[in-house]
Amino acid sequence: MKYIVAIIQPDRLEEVLDRLTEKEIHLVTVTNVLGRGRQKGISEVYRSHKEAGSLLRKLKIEIAVNDDYVKQAMEAIVQGARTGKIGDGKIFVLDLHDVLRIRTGETGKNAIG
């Protein structure tokens, strides 16, 4: 089992969710986050004064998948999130040691679905 964490642009969420649904991946958690990468934040002009913000709004998508779905999940995220511009995001894949579905007590692969 793997735990996939993706950081994407907020305006790409619906596209990513559509691509995940096409691949039969439905269990997703989405969180608003702040962060920066190589683009190092943004600069805005407010009342003739240039203000630099070091953190940008992003979305964090978290998905627990069985090993058979890792490649499909990553492909779906890339297809939905990629614009070809700096700031498209990152995908991290982590080992997932165990899962417990609270309602039923199921563990492991059965708890993911």
Task: Describe the predicted segments one by one.
Residues 1-113:
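Positively charged, small/polar-rich N-terminal and surface patches that mediate targeting and assembly
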